[in-house]
Amino acid sequence: MMVIRPVERSDVSALMQLASKTGGGLTSLPANEATLSVRIERAIKTWQGELPKSEQGYVFVLEDSETGTVAGICAIEVAVGLNDPWYNYRVGTLVHASKELNVYNALPTLFLSNDHTGSSELCTLFLDPKWRKEGNGYLLSKSRFMFMAAFRDKFNDKVVAEMRGVIDEHGYSPFWQSLGKRFFSMDFSRADFLCGTGQKAFIAELMPKHPIYTYFLSQEAQDVIGQVHPQTAPARAVLEKEGFRYRNYIDIFDGGPTLECDIDRVRAIRKSRLVEVAEGQPAQGDFPACLVANENYHHFRVVLVRTDPATERLILTAAQLDVLKCHAGDRVRLVRLCAEEKTA
């Protein structure tokens, strides 16, 4: 049975294996054991209540409960940009006009922005390609909404998610090649690694401070503004079905889109509800896949089951209860996947 749980110190080697499979561009999952160990420690201290809000971040893993195999990772940053500036480009417009010459030009322009400072962030979503089946991607991505719904007071009113932009298998980013490299004088992979290992001072030191006309970029770079990496397209679709939208903010490195949504308008958060759980044999039928989560902050668990999403009393097997760390009579959080999201 696949289950979402909080990260543990012993997961570092499994996370290293996942990091080696990302293909680059996933800044928050570098193949660097020391950095990953620090990230795990920060998550543990967040759960223990030892960090200020500006440093808090939760990390979860997707595990096969029978074998202990870690198949994926996802995370939530509680409030971005309160220690180090959190940069985007806002894709806007500058107008240059002359009535005398009868010239009017509306030019797409990139403006350096810190507009999402303080927002909660969905990040570090990666599922091992071997496990991209049977609804595991939905479970991994949406489990964070179950945690946010259960512990709403831990998070801010806006949630953002940076989507990985267009990068090829060799680490070539058209957007970086045309823009970032001119200011940072390094390859994309080097900048990505420095950022992922916490060495972010160079961003503030070398970033272009003035608006940039996109027409000055190569056509290849212009074409990937706001576009996602092919492997990231499913993750974008999942978030958009939950209510997230692209509001013309992009990543400063690869030009990938930043999606955003008010936390209380996220479908899974808004529609999830608490029901009593009982032990027994679940009813058979053509029921939809639903997320089921306990309400245990320190031992949070989420699984995917097929059940009636309108039930007032959820029947689970002894094995399911055990994985969820629940007992008969406990209350669990329940919400169905979107109607079009299939797990077969």
From Swiss-Prot:
Which reaction is this enzyme known to catalyze?
succinyl-CoA + L-arginine = N(2)-succinyl-L-arginine + CoA + H(+)
Q: Acyltransferase: present as a keyword of the record?
A: yes
Pathway annotation: Amino-acid degradation; L-arginine degradation via AST pathway; L-glutamate and succinate from L-arginine: step 1/5
Protein EC: 2.3.1.109
Enumerate the Gene Ontology biological process terms: arginine catabolic process to glutamate; arginine catabolic process to succinate
| PANTHER family noted in UniProt | ARGININE N-SUCCINYLTRANSFERASE (PTHR30420:SF1), N-SUCCINYLARGININE DIHYDROLASE (PTHR30420)
Q: What is this protein called?
A: Arginine N-succinyltransferase
